[in-house]
A protein has these predicted regions:
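A donor-sugar binding/catalytic signature common to diverse glycosyltransferases
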Residues: 112-116, 299-344
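Conserved nucleotide-sugar donor-binding subdomain of glycosyltransferases
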Residues: 74-114, 119-120, 160-165
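Conserved nucleotide-sugar phosphate-binding/catalytic loop shared by glycosyltransferases and other
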Residues: 29-30, 34-92
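C-terminal amphipathic helix plus adjacent low-complexity
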Residues: 373-408
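Active-site donor-nucleotide binding/catalytic segment of nucleotide-sugar enzymes
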Residues: 8-9, 19, 187-191, 212-272, ...
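Short amphipathic alpha-helix
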Residues: 16-28
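Active-site-proximal region of nucleotide-activated glycan assembly enzymes
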Residues: 131-217
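Donor nucleotide-activated moiety binding/catalytic core segment of transferases
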Residues: 99-100, 278-284, 289-319
Length: 408
């Protein structure tokens, strides 16, 4: 019997689970006899059945259901104590969890460990002598690609001496992970202006480092838009889908984004009374605004997105890759600069040509909504979508094929 593939998605966001799920499905399609084990650290109630239906065995690494979207994660002090010891190390370089992962690997004896930006699992695999594949939307730790001034503008108190000392150390760690990986796959197109000083960028010319494009689930075909709308109780007018994302650094930023969406949409309804908005966000309370429908979480939102005039979303990278595979016009919004983990992504999307906004006023967001419902966003987004998905479609099959080669 062949050794299993272990999938180890980062527990911090549903996007890592979703990308690992897409790869799991494709790996199972390539070889239904290949055993796949998923070490699942978050949203077990949603993703355990999804991974099981994809042909994988699921092991929860936690004693209960974990959901990082329902609380904030940072203080406004950027120093060794609060940021490194209080957040970065326990979240991304956790010694206790490293021991747990090594124990799992010893029990499972995998042919390869596929880490979806789970850097703790990556380090454990490398130290344990297991073949390792890193799937990443990041070219380095987020802290490395942001300046102290970026954090100050977001309201952080920055200890420059301590943080400046941390950055090069983090890049060395990320570089070590890359150099000790059999394969590195990324779905983020490189931009020299943003990436030149990162750990991954100098390695992009190496044979085992690949920008592949969107690693997403299959895109739906022949969607019955009328049926999708009926199931959600929607009419036939212009439809906006607005998402407030998953993991947040500060809950007030998520709440501020929701209020801005609502105010901008209320303004839009004055000229487009048949317009509707589906507001999606884990833990989002119901609202009774005219034309607004709230949903907590939609495991498969692709059919809904194909019905929309545009998506309004935070720049979580799995969202970015899914809209690229679908060709959906998208407005990317950051509710607050304190969401530092998404600031680099927003800058990249802006450079590629997408409409973007940081802490927009309701008037500014309304103007973009108006462009969406009148069809004026299509040309603006077309070139940017091509940069994200050069082949014009998802790259999951190609990525799974590369992983399968490592197994062989």
């Amino acid at each position: 019997m062949s050794q299993p593939i272990v999938m180890a998605p980062n527990a911090t966001g549903s996007g890592h689970n979703m990308r690992a799920l897409a790869l799991t499905r494709e790996l199972h399609t390539l070889d239904p006899t290949q055993e796949i084990v998923v070490l699942l650290g978050s949203m077990q109630d949603v993703f355990e059945p999804l991974f099981s239906s994809a042909g994988a065995k699921v092991i929860s690494t936690e004693t209960g259901v974990v959901d990082h979207a329902k609380s904030g994660h940072l203080d406004k002090i950027l120093d060794r104590e609060h940021f490194v010891d209080g957040y970065l190390a326990p979240t991304f370089l956790n010694g206790s969890k490293m021991i747990d992962y090594l124990a799992y690997f010893d029990e499972i004896d995998p042919a390869v460990v596929v880490s979806d930006y789970n850097l703790t699992a990556s380090a454990a695999a490398i130290m344990g002598g297991y073949r390792h594949v890193l799937v990443t939307e990041r070219y380095d730790f987020s802290l490395v690609q942001l300046s102290n001034e970026d954090f100050r503008e977001a309201g952080f108190v920055v200890n420059e001496t301590e943080i400046n000392r941390v950055r090069p150390a983090l890049t060395r760690i990320f570089d070590w992970l890359i150099r000790n990986s059999a394969l590195v796959l990324t779905d983020k197109p490189p931009l020299a202006d943003l990436d030149a000083d990162t750990a991954l960028y100098p390695h992009l010319s190496e044979a085992n480092i690949k920008f592949v494009g969107p690693m997403t689930r299959p895109t739906p075909e022949n969607v019955d838009h009328d049926q999708v709308r009926r199931e959600l109780g929607l009419g036939s007018g212009p439809l906006l889908v607005a998402s407030v994302g998953g993991t947040t650094m500060f809950m007030e930023n998520k709440q501020k984004a929701i209020q801005t969406y609502r105010d901008a949409f209320a303004h839009l309804r004055e000229d487009h009374p048949d317009a509707e908005m589906v507001l999606i966000g884990r833990g989002t309370p119901d609202v009774d605004d005219e034309g607004v429908r709230t949903l907590d979480y939609v495991p498969d939102w692709m059919p809904l997105l194909t019905c929309s005039s545009a998506l309004i979303a935070q720049p979580g990278w799995i969202t970015v890759t899914e809209i690229a595979a679908l060709g959906v016009r998208t407005i990317f919004v950051l509710g607050g600069r304190g969401e530092y983990h998404e600031l680099e992504a927003l800058r990249r999307l802006d450079a590629l040509g997408f409409p973007t906004a940081i802490e927009p006023t309701s008037e500014a967001l309304h103007a973009l909504m108006e462009e969406a419902v009148t069809g004026r966003l299509a040309d603006r987004c077309a070139k940017a979508l091509t940069a994200l998905a050069p082949s014009g479609e998802r790259a999951t099959e190609a990525a799974a094929g590369l992983i399968a080669q490592v197994v062989r």
